[in-house]
Amino acid sequence: MQPFSPIFFHLLFLLNGLSSRAAPSPGQPVVADLQGMLQPSGMPTGTLENLTRDQPTPGSSASHPPEHSETPPSASPHISTKILRETPSPSPFLSLETPIPDQLTSVAESQGTSQMSPSRATLGKPSETPKPDPTGISPSDSPETPKPNPSNTSPPESPESVYTDPTPTLHHESPEISKRDTPKLSPGEESKIPSPRPTQFLSSKSLETYDPSATRHLNSALEPTTHPDPTESPQSVFLTTHNSNPTVVPQTQFPTSPSQNVTETARTSDLEPSSSLPTQPTTFREEATTPSEPGLSPSPEAPAVTRVATPGLSTSDSPGTKELHVPQNSDPKGPDIPLPSARIAGPPAPLEHPNQVAPAPQRHSRGDTVNTIIVVERVKETGVTLVSRPRGSVGGALCLFFAGTGLLIGIFLLLWCLYRRASRHRSFAHHRLRDSGDEPVLHLDAPKDPLDLYFYAPDAWVPSHIATQPPPSTPPLPPKLPPPPRGPQRLEALSPAALSPNFF
Protein backbone atom coordinates (compact mmCIF):
# COMPACT_ATOMS: atom_id res chain seq x y z
CA MET A 1 0.00 0.00 0.00
CA GLN A 2 2.92 2.35 0.47
CA PRO A 3 3.53 2.82 -3.27
CA PHE A 4 -0.16 3.55 -3.75
CA SER A 5 -0.36 6.40 -1.24
CA PRO A 6 1.71 8.90 -3.28
CA ILE A 7 -0.12 7.75 -6.39
CA PHE A 8 -3.48 8.54 -4.86
CA PHE A 9 -2.36 12.04 -3.98
CA HIS A 10 -1.16 12.63 -7.51
CA LEU A 11 -4.34 11.21 -8.94
CA LEU A 12 -6.46 13.47 -6.76
CA PHE A 13 -4.46 16.47 -7.87
CA LEU A 14 -4.82 15.46 -11.50
CA LEU A 15 -8.52 14.78 -11.11
CA ASN A 16 -9.03 18.26 -9.72
CA GLY A 17 -7.25 19.66 -12.75
CA LEU A 18 -9.32 17.49 -15.07
CA SER A 19 -12.57 18.54 -13.46
CA SER A 20 -12.09 21.94 -15.06
CA ARG A 21 -11.60 20.13 -18.41
CA ALA A 22 -8.58 22.12 -19.39
CA ALA A 23 -7.24 21.87 -22.94
CA PRO A 24 -5.17 18.73 -23.72
CA SER A 25 -2.12 20.84 -24.41
CA PRO A 26 -1.72 21.79 -20.74
CA GLY A 27 -2.21 18.12 -19.97
CA GLN A 28 1.21 17.36 -21.43
CA PRO A 29 3.11 19.66 -19.08
CA VAL A 30 1.19 18.09 -16.25
CA VAL A 31 2.37 14.70 -17.36
CA ALA A 32 5.90 16.02 -17.53
CA ASP A 33 5.54 17.36 -13.99
CA LEU A 34 4.15 14.06 -12.86
CA GLN A 35 7.10 12.31 -14.33
CA GLY A 36 9.45 14.63 -12.52
CA MET A 37 7.56 14.15 -9.30
CA LEU A 38 7.18 10.41 -9.62
CA GLN A 39 10.65 9.56 -10.86
CA PRO A 40 12.19 9.98 -7.39
CA SER A 41 9.55 7.57 -6.13
CA GLY A 42 11.26 4.75 -7.89
CA MET A 43 10.19 5.14 -11.52
CA PRO A 44 12.91 3.82 -13.82
CA THR A 45 14.50 6.31 -16.15
CA GLY A 46 13.67 4.03 -19.04
CA THR A 47 10.04 4.74 -18.41
CA LEU A 48 10.60 8.47 -18.68
CA GLU A 49 12.50 7.96 -21.88
CA ASN A 50 9.70 5.92 -23.32
CA LEU A 51 7.26 8.57 -22.26
CA THR A 52 9.29 11.31 -23.91
CA ARG A 53 9.46 9.27 -27.06
CA ASP A 54 5.72 8.90 -26.99
CA GLN A 55 5.13 12.60 -26.44
CA PRO A 56 6.56 14.18 -29.59
CA THR A 57 4.15 12.63 -32.08
CA PRO A 58 0.54 12.24 -31.07
CA GLY A 59 -0.06 10.48 -34.35
CA SER A 60 2.69 7.95 -33.72
CA SER A 61 0.39 5.80 -31.64
CA ALA A 62 0.72 3.10 -34.22
CA SER A 63 4.50 3.34 -34.25
CA HIS A 64 4.91 3.15 -30.46
CA PRO A 65 2.88 0.02 -29.95
CA PRO A 66 5.82 -2.24 -30.88
CA GLU A 67 7.16 -1.70 -27.37
CA HIS A 68 4.18 -3.31 -25.88
CA SER A 69 3.46 -6.92 -26.36
CA GLU A 70 6.00 -9.05 -24.52
CA THR A 71 5.30 -8.29 -20.97
CA PRO A 72 4.89 -11.10 -18.41
CA PRO A 73 1.27 -11.88 -17.61
CA SER A 74 1.53 -9.73 -14.50
CA ALA A 75 2.44 -6.76 -16.65
CA SER A 76 -0.13 -7.73 -19.25
CA PRO A 77 -2.62 -5.13 -18.00
CA HIS A 78 -0.07 -2.47 -18.78
CA ILE A 79 0.51 -3.97 -22.18
CA SER A 80 -3.16 -4.03 -22.91
CA THR A 81 -3.51 -0.43 -21.90
CA LYS A 82 -0.67 0.63 -24.09
CA ILE A 83 -2.02 -1.37 -27.00
CA LEU A 84 -5.40 0.12 -26.51
CA ARG A 85 -4.18 3.66 -26.34
CA GLU A 86 -1.75 3.33 -29.17
CA THR A 87 -4.11 1.41 -31.37
CA PRO A 88 -6.66 4.21 -31.72
CA SER A 89 -4.70 5.79 -34.56
CA PRO A 90 -7.98 5.88 -36.49
CA SER A 91 -9.45 7.82 -33.59
CA PRO A 92 -8.24 11.22 -34.89
CA PHE A 93 -10.78 11.44 -37.63
CA LEU A 94 -13.47 10.20 -35.29
CA SER A 95 -12.63 12.78 -32.72
CA LEU A 96 -12.63 15.39 -35.46
CA GLU A 97 -16.06 14.20 -36.48
CA THR A 98 -17.45 14.72 -33.02
CA PRO A 99 -18.41 18.38 -32.69
CA ILE A 100 -18.30 18.44 -28.88
CA PRO A 101 -15.62 20.79 -27.52
CA ASP A 102 -15.59 18.93 -24.20
CA GLN A 103 -13.58 16.16 -25.78
CA LEU A 104 -10.63 18.45 -26.20
CA THR A 105 -11.38 18.58 -29.91
CA SER A 106 -7.86 18.30 -31.26
CA VAL A 107 -7.33 14.64 -32.01
CA ALA A 108 -3.63 15.13 -32.30
CA GLU A 109 -3.54 16.63 -28.82
CA SER A 110 -5.65 13.86 -27.42
CA GLN A 111 -3.45 11.22 -28.93
CA GLY A 112 -0.39 13.12 -27.82
CA THR A 113 -1.71 13.25 -24.32
CA SER A 114 -2.54 9.58 -24.45
CA GLN A 115 1.00 8.86 -25.56
CA MET A 116 2.31 11.16 -22.87
CA SER A 117 0.22 9.33 -20.34
CA PRO A 118 2.53 7.80 -17.76
CA SER A 119 0.73 4.58 -18.38
CA ARG A 120 2.24 4.43 -21.87
CA ALA A 121 5.63 5.42 -20.67
CA THR A 122 5.50 2.83 -17.99
CA LEU A 123 4.06 0.31 -20.35
CA GLY A 124 6.78 0.98 -22.85
CA LYS A 125 9.35 0.04 -20.30
CA PRO A 126 7.82 -3.25 -19.19
CA SER A 127 7.13 -4.29 -22.76
CA GLU A 128 10.48 -5.27 -24.17
CA THR A 129 9.38 -6.65 -27.54
CA PRO A 130 8.10 -4.39 -30.33
CA LYS A 131 4.39 -4.55 -30.91
CA PRO A 132 3.01 -4.62 -34.46
CA ASP A 133 0.47 -2.03 -35.46
CA PRO A 134 -2.93 -2.64 -33.88
CA THR A 135 -4.36 -3.08 -37.32
CA GLY A 136 -1.62 -5.51 -38.20
CA ILE A 137 -1.56 -7.22 -34.82
CA SER A 138 -2.25 -10.89 -35.20
CA PRO A 139 -3.27 -13.33 -32.48
CA SER A 140 0.41 -14.20 -32.27
CA ASP A 141 0.87 -10.85 -30.49
CA SER A 142 -0.63 -12.41 -27.38
CA PRO A 143 1.73 -15.22 -26.37
CA GLU A 144 -0.45 -16.51 -23.57
CA THR A 145 -3.97 -16.35 -24.94
CA PRO A 146 -5.32 -17.97 -28.07
CA LYS A 147 -5.52 -15.46 -30.86
CA PRO A 148 -9.09 -14.26 -31.43
CA ASN A 149 -10.45 -14.17 -34.93
CA PRO A 150 -10.11 -10.60 -36.24
CA SER A 151 -13.53 -11.02 -37.82
CA ASN A 152 -15.32 -11.11 -34.46
CA THR A 153 -15.63 -14.88 -34.80
CA SER A 154 -15.69 -15.55 -31.04
CA PRO A 155 -17.35 -12.88 -28.90
CA PRO A 156 -16.22 -14.58 -25.67
CA GLU A 157 -12.60 -14.50 -26.71
CA SER A 158 -12.58 -10.93 -27.93
CA PRO A 159 -15.12 -8.77 -26.13
CA GLU A 160 -14.11 -5.94 -28.33
CA SER A 161 -14.82 -7.85 -31.53
CA VAL A 162 -18.43 -7.80 -30.42
CA TYR A 163 -18.15 -4.07 -30.21
CA THR A 164 -16.97 -3.62 -33.77
CA ASP A 165 -20.25 -1.95 -34.65
CA PRO A 166 -19.83 0.93 -32.23
CA THR A 167 -16.15 1.21 -33.09
CA PRO A 168 -16.34 4.66 -34.67
CA THR A 169 -18.03 6.09 -31.64
CA LEU A 170 -15.75 4.25 -29.31
CA HIS A 171 -12.84 5.48 -31.29
CA HIS A 172 -13.90 9.01 -30.83
CA GLU A 173 -14.41 8.36 -27.20
CA SER A 174 -11.11 6.63 -26.68
CA PRO A 175 -8.80 9.60 -27.34
CA GLU A 176 -10.71 11.62 -24.85
CA ILE A 177 -10.58 8.89 -22.28
CA SER A 178 -6.89 8.52 -22.88
CA LYS A 179 -6.48 12.22 -22.21
CA ARG A 180 -8.30 11.93 -19.00
CA ASP A 181 -6.33 8.90 -18.02
CA THR A 182 -3.04 10.53 -18.88
CA PRO A 183 -2.90 12.87 -15.91
CA LYS A 184 -4.31 10.23 -13.62
CA LEU A 185 -1.59 7.68 -14.24
CA SER A 186 1.95 8.56 -13.43
CA PRO A 187 4.95 6.68 -14.82
CA GLY A 188 6.09 5.96 -11.31
CA GLU A 189 2.75 4.39 -10.55
CA GLU A 190 2.76 2.16 -13.56
CA SER A 191 6.31 0.99 -13.01
CA LYS A 192 5.59 0.17 -9.37
CA ILE A 193 2.09 -1.18 -9.69
CA PRO A 194 1.68 -4.41 -11.66
CA SER A 195 -2.00 -3.64 -12.19
CA PRO A 196 -2.47 -0.33 -14.02
CA ARG A 197 -5.25 2.04 -13.09
CA PRO A 198 -8.65 0.87 -14.22
CA THR A 199 -9.06 4.08 -16.19
CA GLN A 200 -5.94 3.32 -18.16
CA PHE A 201 -7.13 -0.09 -19.15
CA LEU A 202 -10.55 1.19 -19.90
CA SER A 203 -9.32 3.98 -22.08
CA SER A 204 -6.92 1.69 -23.88
CA LYS A 205 -9.61 -0.87 -24.32
CA SER A 206 -12.01 1.68 -25.65
CA LEU A 207 -9.35 2.78 -28.11
CA GLU A 208 -8.90 -0.74 -29.29
CA THR A 209 -12.52 -1.58 -29.57
CA TYR A 210 -13.32 1.58 -31.37
CA ASP A 211 -11.13 0.80 -34.35
CA PRO A 212 -13.01 -1.70 -36.48
CA SER A 213 -9.77 -3.29 -37.66
CA ALA A 214 -7.74 -2.46 -34.60
CA THR A 215 -10.31 -3.82 -32.23
CA ARG A 216 -9.95 -7.30 -33.53
CA HIS A 217 -6.18 -7.18 -33.40
CA LEU A 218 -6.23 -5.49 -30.04
CA ASN A 219 -8.48 -8.16 -28.72
CA SER A 220 -5.88 -10.71 -29.64
CA ALA A 221 -3.23 -8.63 -27.97
CA LEU A 222 -5.28 -7.95 -24.91
CA GLU A 223 -6.33 -11.49 -24.33
CA PRO A 224 -2.85 -12.56 -23.29
CA THR A 225 -3.03 -10.08 -20.48
CA THR A 226 -6.44 -11.20 -19.35
CA HIS A 227 -7.69 -14.30 -17.57
CA PRO A 228 -7.31 -17.65 -19.26
CA ASP A 229 -11.12 -17.76 -19.31
CA PRO A 230 -11.93 -15.56 -22.31
CA THR A 231 -15.10 -17.51 -22.93
CA GLU A 232 -16.71 -16.60 -19.63
CA SER A 233 -16.18 -12.89 -19.91
CA PRO A 234 -14.62 -11.31 -22.99
CA GLN A 235 -13.68 -8.37 -20.85
CA SER A 236 -12.15 -10.61 -18.24
CA VAL A 237 -9.05 -9.99 -20.26
CA PHE A 238 -9.21 -6.48 -18.96
CA LEU A 239 -10.04 -7.66 -15.50
CA THR A 240 -8.75 -4.66 -13.72
CA THR A 241 -9.73 -1.65 -15.72
CA HIS A 242 -10.62 -2.45 -19.29
CA ASN A 243 -14.14 -3.52 -18.63
CA SER A 244 -15.83 -0.27 -17.71
CA ASN A 245 -15.11 1.89 -20.76
CA PRO A 246 -15.74 -0.65 -23.53
CA THR A 247 -18.76 -1.97 -21.77
CA VAL A 248 -20.16 1.49 -21.36
CA VAL A 249 -19.72 2.39 -25.01
CA PRO A 250 -21.57 -0.62 -26.36
CA GLN A 251 -24.31 0.05 -23.89
CA THR A 252 -24.77 3.60 -25.01
CA GLN A 253 -24.58 2.91 -28.70
CA PHE A 254 -26.39 -0.37 -29.07
CA PRO A 255 -28.57 -1.19 -26.12
CA THR A 256 -30.32 -3.85 -28.19
CA SER A 257 -27.26 -5.35 -29.86
CA PRO A 258 -26.28 -8.86 -28.62
CA SER A 259 -22.75 -7.59 -28.16
CA GLN A 260 -23.94 -5.70 -25.12
CA ASN A 261 -24.81 -8.93 -23.41
CA VAL A 262 -21.30 -10.16 -23.90
CA THR A 263 -19.84 -6.91 -22.75
CA GLU A 264 -22.00 -6.85 -19.67
CA THR A 265 -21.18 -10.40 -18.77
CA ALA A 266 -17.55 -9.58 -19.19
CA ARG A 267 -18.05 -6.46 -17.19
CA THR A 268 -19.65 -8.32 -14.35
CA SER A 269 -16.68 -10.64 -14.16
CA ASP A 270 -14.24 -7.80 -14.56
CA LEU A 271 -15.87 -5.38 -12.17
CA GLU A 272 -15.06 -7.58 -9.21
CA PRO A 273 -11.27 -7.66 -9.76
CA SER A 274 -11.21 -4.08 -10.91
CA SER A 275 -13.13 -2.77 -7.92
CA SER A 276 -9.88 -2.81 -5.96
CA LEU A 277 -8.43 -0.17 -8.26
CA PRO A 278 -9.12 3.37 -7.04
CA THR A 279 -9.27 5.03 -10.45
CA GLN A 280 -11.77 2.67 -11.99
CA PRO A 281 -14.74 4.42 -10.38
CA THR A 282 -14.37 7.05 -13.05
CA THR A 283 -15.07 4.51 -15.72
CA PHE A 284 -18.03 3.13 -13.88
CA ARG A 285 -19.33 6.59 -13.44
CA GLU A 286 -19.06 7.11 -17.15
CA GLU A 287 -20.99 3.94 -17.72
CA ALA A 288 -23.76 4.98 -15.42
CA THR A 289 -24.03 8.53 -16.67
CA THR A 290 -23.56 8.12 -20.38
CA PRO A 291 -25.90 5.22 -21.15
CA SER A 292 -28.96 7.38 -20.65
CA GLU A 293 -28.23 9.54 -23.67
CA PRO A 294 -26.38 7.10 -25.94
CA GLY A 295 -28.98 4.43 -25.45
CA LEU A 296 -31.46 6.72 -27.17
CA SER A 297 -29.27 7.40 -30.18
CA PRO A 298 -27.35 4.45 -31.62
CA SER A 299 -25.42 6.84 -33.86
CA PRO A 300 -21.67 6.56 -33.15
CA GLU A 301 -21.19 10.29 -32.70
CA ALA A 302 -23.89 10.78 -30.10
CA PRO A 303 -22.53 8.09 -27.75
CA ALA A 304 -19.10 9.54 -28.20
CA VAL A 305 -20.40 12.95 -27.25
CA THR A 306 -22.06 11.57 -24.21
CA ARG A 307 -18.82 9.92 -23.36
CA VAL A 308 -17.05 13.20 -23.65
CA ALA A 309 -19.40 14.83 -21.22
CA THR A 310 -19.22 11.94 -18.80
CA PRO A 311 -15.43 11.53 -18.57
CA GLY A 312 -15.00 14.82 -16.77
CA LEU A 313 -17.57 13.80 -14.24
CA SER A 314 -16.16 10.33 -13.88
CA THR A 315 -12.66 11.58 -13.25
CA SER A 316 -13.86 13.58 -10.28
CA ASP A 317 -15.58 10.55 -8.84
CA SER A 318 -14.11 8.89 -5.80
CA PRO A 319 -13.63 5.12 -5.33
CA GLY A 320 -16.76 5.19 -3.20
CA THR A 321 -18.80 6.19 -6.23
CA LYS A 322 -17.31 3.34 -8.11
CA GLU A 323 -18.82 0.91 -5.69
CA LEU A 324 -22.21 2.53 -6.12
CA HIS A 325 -22.09 2.21 -9.89
CA VAL A 326 -20.49 -1.19 -10.04
CA PRO A 327 -23.53 -3.12 -8.88
CA GLN A 328 -25.64 -1.31 -11.45
CA ASN A 329 -23.29 -2.02 -14.32
CA SER A 330 -22.59 -5.51 -13.11
CA ASP A 331 -26.11 -6.61 -14.01
CA PRO A 332 -25.84 -9.19 -16.78
CA LYS A 333 -28.79 -7.71 -18.65
CA GLY A 334 -27.49 -6.59 -22.01
CA PRO A 335 -30.36 -4.52 -23.47
CA ASP A 336 -31.24 -3.02 -20.08
CA ILE A 337 -27.73 -1.84 -19.30
CA PRO A 338 -27.74 0.98 -21.86
CA LEU A 339 -30.09 2.80 -19.52
CA PRO A 340 -28.24 2.62 -16.18
CA SER A 341 -29.55 6.04 -15.30
CA ALA A 342 -33.08 4.73 -15.74
CA ARG A 343 -32.21 1.76 -13.59
CA ILE A 344 -30.75 4.01 -10.97
CA ALA A 345 -33.92 6.04 -10.93
CA GLY A 346 -35.91 2.83 -10.97
CA PRO A 347 -34.79 1.25 -7.71
CA PRO A 348 -35.64 4.34 -5.65
CA ALA A 349 -39.13 4.40 -7.15
CA PRO A 350 -39.84 0.81 -6.16
CA LEU A 351 -38.55 1.63 -2.73
CA GLU A 352 -40.88 4.61 -2.54
CA HIS A 353 -43.84 2.53 -3.67
CA PRO A 354 -43.20 -0.05 -0.97
CA ASN A 355 -43.00 2.79 1.49
CA GLN A 356 -46.38 4.01 0.33
CA VAL A 357 -47.77 0.51 0.58
CA ALA A 358 -46.29 0.12 4.04
CA PRO A 359 -48.41 2.90 5.58
CA ALA A 360 -51.57 1.04 4.64
CA PRO A 361 -50.54 -2.08 6.56
CA GLN A 362 -49.56 0.18 9.41
CA ARG A 363 -53.01 1.74 9.31
CA HIS A 364 -54.52 -1.70 9.36
CA SER A 365 -52.35 -2.58 12.28
CA ARG A 366 -53.42 0.60 14.00
CA GLY A 367 -57.04 -0.39 13.46
CA ASP A 368 -56.25 -3.73 14.99
CA THR A 369 -54.73 -2.05 17.99
CA VAL A 370 -57.83 0.11 18.34
CA ASN A 371 -59.96 -3.01 18.31
CA THR A 372 -57.85 -4.51 21.03
CA ILE A 373 -58.22 -1.35 23.05
CA ILE A 374 -61.97 -1.58 22.69
CA VAL A 375 -61.85 -5.13 23.92
CA VAL A 376 -59.89 -4.01 26.94
CA GLU A 377 -62.41 -1.29 27.63
CA ARG A 378 -65.21 -3.81 27.51
CA VAL A 379 -63.38 -5.95 29.99
CA LYS A 380 -62.98 -2.95 32.23
CA GLU A 381 -66.68 -2.23 31.96
CA THR A 382 -67.70 -5.76 32.77
CA GLY A 383 -65.21 -6.32 35.54
CA VAL A 384 -63.87 -3.43 37.57
CA THR A 385 -61.53 -5.83 39.28
CA LEU A 386 -59.37 -5.88 36.20
CA VAL A 387 -58.96 -2.14 36.41
CA SER A 388 -58.24 -2.30 40.13
CA ARG A 389 -55.69 -5.04 39.76
CA PRO A 390 -52.87 -2.75 38.72
CA ARG A 391 -53.74 -0.41 41.59
CA GLY A 392 -54.04 -3.31 44.03
CA SER A 393 -50.65 -4.59 43.03
CA VAL A 394 -49.07 -1.36 44.14
CA GLY A 395 -51.56 -0.12 46.72
CA GLY A 396 -52.03 -3.55 48.23
CA ALA A 397 -48.41 -3.74 49.19
CA LEU A 398 -48.62 -0.34 50.83
CA CYS A 399 -51.78 -1.31 52.67
CA LEU A 400 -50.16 -4.45 53.95
CA PHE A 401 -47.13 -2.51 55.09
CA PHE A 402 -49.14 0.10 56.98
CA ALA A 403 -51.44 -2.52 58.46
CA GLY A 404 -48.52 -4.50 59.77
CA THR A 405 -46.87 -1.47 61.30
CA GLY A 406 -50.17 -0.43 62.89
CA LEU A 407 -50.68 -3.83 64.41
CA LEU A 408 -47.19 -3.82 65.90
CA ILE A 409 -47.68 -0.35 67.37
CA GLY A 410 -51.02 -1.36 68.87
CA ILE A 411 -49.52 -4.43 70.44
CA PHE A 412 -46.75 -2.42 72.07
CA LEU A 413 -49.24 0.16 73.40
CA LEU A 414 -51.43 -2.57 74.87
CA LEU A 415 -48.52 -4.17 76.64
CA TRP A 416 -47.43 -0.84 78.04
CA CYS A 417 -50.90 -0.07 79.39
CA LEU A 418 -51.12 -3.46 81.03
CA TYR A 419 -47.75 -2.97 82.57
CA ARG A 420 -48.65 0.40 84.01
CA ARG A 421 -51.88 -0.90 85.44
CA ALA A 422 -50.25 -3.87 87.04
CA SER A 423 -47.51 -1.73 88.50
CA ARG A 424 -50.07 0.56 90.16
CA HIS A 425 -52.04 -2.18 91.87
CA ARG A 426 -49.07 -4.29 92.89
CA SER A 427 -45.77 -2.98 94.09
CA PHE A 428 -42.73 -5.15 94.05
CA ALA A 429 -39.05 -4.78 94.78
CA HIS A 430 -38.53 -2.45 91.88
CA HIS A 431 -40.81 0.00 93.70
CA ARG A 432 -38.74 0.18 96.83
CA LEU A 433 -38.23 3.88 96.26
CA ARG A 434 -40.95 5.93 97.93
CA ASP A 435 -41.10 8.34 95.10
CA SER A 436 -39.86 8.16 91.61
CA GLY A 437 -38.23 11.54 92.15
CA ASP A 438 -36.28 10.50 95.23
CA GLU A 439 -32.65 9.80 94.91
CA PRO A 440 -31.63 6.26 95.65
CA VAL A 441 -28.85 7.56 97.95
CA LEU A 442 -31.44 8.67 100.50
CA HIS A 443 -32.54 5.12 101.04
CA LEU A 444 -29.22 3.34 101.15
CA ASP A 445 -29.24 3.19 104.89
CA ALA A 446 -32.80 1.91 105.12
CA PRO A 447 -33.16 -1.28 107.14
CA LYS A 448 -33.09 -4.39 105.05
CA ASP A 449 -35.56 -6.74 106.44
CA PRO A 450 -36.78 -9.74 104.62
CA LEU A 451 -40.10 -7.98 104.11
CA ASP A 452 -38.47 -4.89 102.72
CA LEU A 453 -36.82 -6.92 100.05
CA TYR A 454 -40.06 -8.45 98.89
CA PHE A 455 -42.77 -6.09 99.99
CA TYR A 456 -42.44 -2.44 100.66
CA ALA A 457 -45.18 0.18 100.43
CA PRO A 458 -43.94 3.65 101.17
CA ASP A 459 -47.35 5.14 100.60
CA ALA A 460 -48.90 2.72 103.06
CA TRP A 461 -48.25 2.43 106.72
CA VAL A 462 -44.68 2.65 107.94
CA PRO A 463 -43.52 0.12 110.56
CA SER A 464 -42.75 1.71 113.88
CA HIS A 465 -39.52 -0.08 114.50
CA ILE A 466 -38.13 1.24 111.25
CA ALA A 467 -39.09 4.79 112.02
CA THR A 468 -38.10 4.87 115.73
CA GLN A 469 -35.01 2.68 115.85
CA PRO A 470 -31.81 4.78 115.66
CA PRO A 471 -29.21 3.90 113.18
CA PRO A 472 -26.62 1.44 114.46
CA SER A 473 -23.30 2.84 115.69
CA THR A 474 -20.18 2.40 113.66
CA PRO A 475 -17.85 -0.34 114.85
CA PRO A 476 -14.73 0.76 116.86
CA LEU A 477 -11.51 1.28 114.96
CA PRO A 478 -8.80 -1.37 115.29
CA PRO A 479 -5.70 -0.62 117.54
CA LYS A 480 -3.02 1.48 115.94
CA LEU A 481 -0.04 -0.40 114.62
CA PRO A 482 3.54 0.86 115.23
CA PRO A 483 4.77 3.07 112.50
CA PRO A 484 6.93 1.45 109.89
CA PRO A 485 10.69 1.70 110.41
CA ARG A 486 12.21 4.72 108.83
CA GLY A 487 15.32 4.62 106.73
CA PRO A 488 16.78 1.65 104.95
CA GLN A 489 16.41 -1.59 106.73
CA ARG A 490 19.47 -3.76 107.31
CA LEU A 491 19.36 -6.94 105.38
CA GLU A 492 20.96 -10.07 106.66
CA ALA A 493 22.36 -12.76 104.44
CA LEU A 494 20.59 -16.02 104.97
CA SER A 495 23.33 -18.53 104.36
CA PRO A 496 24.09 -21.82 106.18
CA ALA A 497 27.21 -20.33 107.70
CA ALA A 498 25.32 -17.36 109.06
CA LEU A 499 22.67 -19.55 110.65
CA SER A 500 23.16 -20.66 114.14
CA PRO A 501 23.73 -24.34 114.75
CA ASN A 502 20.48 -24.55 116.59
CA PHE A 503 18.44 -22.97 113.75
CA PHE A 504 15.81 -25.23 112.39
Swiss-Prot record:
Biased composition (Low complexity): 150-161
Superkingdom of origin: Eukaryota
Keyword Glycoprotein part of the UniProt annotation: yes
Residue ranges, annotated region (Disordered): 36-365, 467-504
Disruption-associated phenotype: Various olfactory phenotypes, such as abnormal localization of ADCY3, shortened olfactory cilia, and reduced electrophysiological and behavioral sensitivities to odorants.
Positions with biased composition (Basic and acidic residues): 170-192
Glycan-linked positions: N50
Membrane topology type: Single-pass type I membrane protein
Transmembrane segments: 398-418
Functional summary from the UniProt entry: Required for proper function of the olfactory system. May be involved in establishing the acuity of olfactory sensory signaling.
Protein's name according to its UniProt entry: Golgi-associated olfactory signaling regulator
Record organism: Mus musculus
